[in-house]
Amino acid sequence: MKLHGRGVHLFSQFVGSLVFLAVFQDQGRRMNIDLSTLAPTQVYHLMTQTVIPRPIAWVLTDSGEQNFNLAPFSYFTAVSSRPPLLMISVGKKPNGDIKDTTRNALETGKLVIHIAPSDLADKVTLSSATLEHGESELETTQLETVDFQGFELPRLEGAPIAFGCKLHEVIEMGETPQSLIFAEIEHIYVDERVISMEGDRLKVDALAVDPLARLGGNEYATLEKTFSVARPK
């Protein structure tokens, strides 16, 4: 039997699954997994179930003439405060083209990164669908934007935190490759209902923000509770 194209790909995944299960059965509950034995999709699924919880960057960019693109990314973190940088890892479309978020950021140099509340989980998920370039997720999600004071792009209404950013750098990484987007924060919007003052510092109430967090598969998480531990002096 000869396999071609997608058949070879599926067969390779099947063999990889058998190897993974064999390792699991051999070691029982004490898993020590050699990633070189896994298929790329298995590595992805394992990473997204173990690097948890992950914050979600809900990114708005301009496709041109106020036609806004919106997409969520959970390979996302803060990397520096001087300069104030955020990093988002963006993959490719199924056909191998760069995603609109990357394309728009490169062309306009601007993006707005939102922290989505848990009650917008359905909208976040819906905005992850692949659309044709120029189609807007704002239409499919029926979300509204409002003016982002002091920044060129608008922000999403209903998101308690928004970062107005300029593009700092894009680095291509890996075999796919992924686009690592480094965005420098120029303006921050915080809903006044989630902030208070502690001396000369602003304090953001994390439970009031109620940020949506990403787990593996289709699963999300919420904070539910916070606690403090004093740092050593």
Locate each region found by the language model.
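Polar low-complexity intrinsically disordered regions enriched in Ser/Thr and small residues
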Residues: 8-10, 19, 202, 220
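Short, Lys/Arg-enriched N-terminal segments with co-localized hydrophobic residues
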Residues: 16-30
